[in-house]
Structures are given as structure tokens and as C-alpha cells.
């Protein structure tokens, strides 16, 4: 069977970085002749791009792998691949656990898939987890959307948060050059994409590893400089970035977001805990007072800006009073969106070895209480939209109501309204908001806007 007759399927777990990696690997496979299959059980190559941030995601991978391993006994020419963070963490141990695997590859090796696959097709079992310099990918990704796209700007993370496995599995920070990032965005603009999200595990660290400093001693290349550099890319209407770290978030960045017309008024800045002792134990490098100052400064420049974040409950040793400090921070700030999780011990992290682990019952109770408050505060934040006219970029049809389309406001609020997706996809539409929920809006279209800011 030639590659042009072979079908592939990729299942992606985890964060936006993983989704972007999967799109690049799909592009590589299609570049060498593979065809996409919606059904993994009909595919000749099955790739799981994995996440190890939470134990439940990791266990789900092993469940899926078990099914495909059985299938390989019936279909010996099936190529079975595990990529991503579980692959990096487990390495050769994965082959011992699932001997049917053909390739185990860490996230730094995503761009090398074609070369690694050649080794597999030559009859080898391959493990690629050694640290490498990430080279520019010349293969076009197979992107899920035709309207919005992710662009990686920095890989890896140099932080050492005591709960987080990311630095172990994604390696040290490696920034792409501004020229390479802009070139990719220019091509996306030419292809009709309207919105770009610049991605990094710690995007505020962008450029620290690139050569050059200014006369004042500042790094010559920063996220702020990058935003100014790419703001005028033709065809691109909106620019977002994620994920920010409070330790490196600057007022200069806020000013840039206010000044640059294409940069959306939405900030994703994880706080993880509202208690200073826990933040210190996590090695986050800031206090809750510093975090509040950042949010206050954003709202000073952009009062209507949307704020989203991440938070962990049940970190080892967390007392009820410390958890209530997190609740107080959420109450005081009022987030538009908050991604919450119960602490999950991860192999190779300091916190996993501590003897003051909390019970699953306590963690579950606190997670429910936090989520309840998050929904209340988000619903309160949504009220400000009622009756307003919002700019919405139409992305797709509403899968629950095919008479509606859906898109996002500049503040990243999911919005639904009646319309024909064939006419509106990729268009900026002014929508009058007639109904609000905690995390979504509904409205009526007012008019289609020009889709060229350049």
C-alpha cells in the first residue's frame, strides 16, 4: 500500500500548544500523501498527541492505546504513534507497557515526523525524546479552522512551578524569530484567515533567549515588540496571545494592547491560588497583591477588557482558609472565564512527593464550590453586554441549532445569532446582544463590517 492510499487519524489531548502541534503533524502526513480518516478504527496510521498535566487525561490515552494495540494484532501494518507530553515523560517505558507501539516522540520532535516515520517504515521501533533545537517547520499545517489559526512564537518553559511537569516534557524556552512569525502570519492572511492567536507556554518570556539588548538593557525582542511588528499584517483582523505569566506581565504590554487596533481586549493570566503562602509553595514568583495590581492596571487602560485565568484547588497542604483566599480573589476580580482544576500529582514534580496531600473528597468539594462562584461572577460580567452592539467574527454554524452561526467577540465571548454560515463565515458582524448567559451571548445581526483593517 502506497502512502497515497494510507489513511491517518490524530487524537489530541490537552492544551492549545498540543492542538497546534497536531495541525503541524497532520500537515506533514498529508504532504507525504496520507489522507485523513474521521474514524481511528479505519485508519492505517493512528497518532495520539498526549497531555500529562492531569492524570485523567493520561489514563484516557492508555485506554485508547489498548484498543488500537489489539487492533494491530489483526492489522499488522497499522502504524501506532504516541506523541506529546506523555511520550516525552515515559519514553522507552511506553514501549514496555505497549509493545505494539511503533513510534514514541516528544513534543520537540513534532516537526521531525516525516524523518521518524521513515525509520518506522524501515522496520524500526523508534523513541525520540532527546532535547533538540526546534527547527522551523516548512510544511503547512492542516488547520481545523479556515477562519482562526494558532501561531507558535515560543516553545518550552524555564519556570519551575512545583506542581507542573511542562518544563520536563517541553524543554527550555526557544523563541522563533520575529521574521519567521510574521512570514507565517502573512501567509495566513493571504489564505483568508482573519484571527491569529500567538501561542507560548509562557508567552511573556518571548525573546529572552534571542540575541540583542536595547541601550536601556531591555531584551531587544519582547512580546510587546512582536505585537507592534505584526499588527499591520494584511488580511489579519484580530490578534490574541496566550498564555501569560504574572511574573513577566508588564504595563508596556498593556499599553501596546490598547494602542494596537488588531490586538483584542482579552487577557488570559493564570493566578492558580489567591493565597500567598500557597503561591510561594508553588514557586509562582508573585503575590496575590501583585496579581490584583496587574488586573487593576489592565482595567485602568481598558475598563471593558475581558479577563480569563486558571486556578488550582487542593494543592498539598491547602487549608480551608487558604482556599477561601482563592474564593475571595475570584469574588473581588470577577473573571469572564476561569479554567479550574483539582490538583493532580504529576511524576517528577516536587509537590507530588510531599506528604500533605489532600483527599479526593476535599478537592472535589472545593472544586465544586469554586466553579459555582465562577459561574455566578461570569453571569454578572455578562450583564454588561445586554443591549450593546458587539463585533463578532463568525467562525462556524451552531451545532445545536443549524439556523444559527457562532463566533466570538473581541473579548472572546462566544456569541450566537441567526444567519447563513455560507454567507457569514469569516465575516466581522455587528450583533446587538439580546440575551446573556454566564459564558455565552445571543443576539441579532445589525450589519456586516468591512473585513480589512490594513
From Swiss-Prot:
Record-annotated Radical SAM core domain positions: 143-380
SUPFAM superfamilies: Radical SAM enzymes
TRAM domain span: 383-447
Binding site for [4Fe-4S] cluster 1: 15, 51, 85
Record-level Gene Ontology MF annotations: 4 iron, 4 sulfur cluster binding; metal ion binding; methylthiotransferase activity
Domain MTTase N-terminal: 6-122
Alphabetized PROSITE patterns for the sequence: MTTASE_N, MTTASE_RADICAL, RADICAL_SAM, TRAM
GO BP annotations, alphabetical order: tRNA methylthiolation
Localisation: Cytoplasm
Cofactor(s) this protein cannot do without: [4Fe-4S] cluster
Residues reported to bind [4Fe-4S] cluster 2: 157, 161, 164
EC numbers: 2.8.4.3
Claim: NADP is one of the keywords in the record: no
The reaction(s) this protein catalyses: N(6)-dimethylallyladenosine(37) in tRNA + (sulfur carrier)-SH + AH2 + 2 S-adenosyl-L-methionine = 2-methylsulfanyl-N(6)-dimethylallyladenosine(37) in tRNA + (sulfur carrier)-H + 5'-deoxyadenosine + L-methionine + A + S-adenosyl-L-homocysteine + 2 H(+)
EC class: transferase
Cofactor note: Binds 2 [4Fe-4S] clusters. One cluster is coordinated with 3 cysteines and an exchangeable S-adenosyl-L-methionine.
Similarity comment: Belongs to the methylthiotransferase family. MiaB subfamily.
Function of the protein: Catalyzes the methylthiolation of N6-(dimethylallyl)adenosine (i(6)A), leading to the formation of 2-methylthio-N6-(dimethylallyl)adenosine (ms(2)i(6)A) at position 37 in tRNAs that read codons beginning with uridine.
Assembly: Monomer.
Protein known as: tRNA-2-methylthio-N(6)-dimethylallyladenosine synthase
Organism this protein belongs to: Gloeothece citriformis (strain PCC 7424)
This protein's encoding gene: miaB
Amino acid at each position: 500500500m502506497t502512502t497515497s492510499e494510507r489513511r491517518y487519524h490524530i487524537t489530541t489531548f490537552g492544551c492549545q500548544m498540543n492542538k497546534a502541534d497536531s495541525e503541524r503533524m497532520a500537515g506533514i502526513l498529508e504532504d507525504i500523501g496520507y489522507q485523513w480518516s474521521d474514524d481511528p478504527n479505519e485508519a492505517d496510521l493512528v497518532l495520539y498527541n498526549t497531555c500529562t498535566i492531569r492524570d485523567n487525561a493520561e489514563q484516557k490515552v492508555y485506554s485508547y492505546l489498548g484498543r488500537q494495540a489489539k487492533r494491530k494484532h489483526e492489522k499488522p501494518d497499522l502504524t501506532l504513534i504516541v506523541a506529546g507530553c506523555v511520550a516525552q515523560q515515559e519514553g522507552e517505558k511506553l514501549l514496555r507497557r505497549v509493545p505494539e507501539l511503533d513510534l514514541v516522540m516528544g513534543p520537540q520532535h513534532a516537526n521531525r515526523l516525516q524523518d521518524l516515520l521513515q525509520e518506522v517504515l524501515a522496520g524500526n521501533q523508534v523513541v525520540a525524546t532527546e532535547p533538540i533545537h526546534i527547527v522551523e517547520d516548512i510544511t503547512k499545517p492542516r488547520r481545523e479552522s479556515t477562519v482562526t489559526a494558532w501561531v507558535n512564537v515560543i516553545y518550552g518553559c524555564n519556570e519551575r512551578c512545583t506542581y507542573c511537569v511542562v518544563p520536563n516534557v517541553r524543554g527550555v524556552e526557544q523563541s522563533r524569530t520575529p521574521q519567521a512569525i510574521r512570514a507565517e502570519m502573512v501567509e495566513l492572511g493571504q489564505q483568508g484567515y482573519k484571527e491569529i492567536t500567538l501561542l507560548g507556554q509562557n508567552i511573556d518570556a518571548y525573546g529572552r533567549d534571542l540575541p540583542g539588548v536595547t541601550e536601556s538593557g531591555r531584551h531587544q525582542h519582547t512580546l510587546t515588540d512582536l505585537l507592534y511588528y505584526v499588527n499591520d499584517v494584511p488580511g489579519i483582523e484580530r490578534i490574541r496571545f496566550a498564555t501569560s505569566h504574572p511574573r513577566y506581565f508588564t504595563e508596556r504590554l498593556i499599553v501596546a494592547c490598547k494602542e494596537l487596533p488588531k490586538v483584542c481586549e482579552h487577557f488570559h493570566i493564570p493566578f492558580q491560588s489567591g493565597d500567598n503562602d500557597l503561591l510561594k509553595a508553588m514557586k509562582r514568583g508573585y503575590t496575590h497583591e501583585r496579581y490584583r495590581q496587574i488586573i487593576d492596571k489592565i482595567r485602568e487602560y481598558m475598563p471593558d477588557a475581558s479577563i480569563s485565568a486558571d486556578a488550582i484547588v487542593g494543592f498539598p497542604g491547602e487549608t480551608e482558609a487558604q482556599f477561601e483566599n482563592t474564593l475571595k480573589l475570584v469574588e473581588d476580580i470577577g473573571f469572564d472565564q476561569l479554567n479550574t482544576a483539582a490538583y493532580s500529582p504529576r511524576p517528577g514534580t516536587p509537590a507530588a512527593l510531599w506528604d500533605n496531600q489532600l483527599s479526593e473528597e476535599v478537592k472535589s468539594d472545593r472544586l465544586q464550590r469554586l466553579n459555582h462562584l465562577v459561574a455566578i461572577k461570569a453571569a454578572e460580567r455578562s450583564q454588561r453586554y445586554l443591549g450593546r452592539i458587539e463585533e463578532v467574527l463568525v467562525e462556524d454554524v451552531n451545532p445545536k441549532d443549524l439556523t444559527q452561526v457562532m463566533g466570538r467577540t473581541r473579548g472572546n465571548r462566544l456569541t450566537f445569532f441567526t444567519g447563513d454560515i455560507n454567507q457569514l463565515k469569516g465575516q466581522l458582524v455587528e450583533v446587538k446582544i439580546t440575551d446573556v448567559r454566564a459564558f455565552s451571548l445571543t443576539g441579532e445581526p445589525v450589519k456586516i463590517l468591512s473585513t480589512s483593517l490594513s
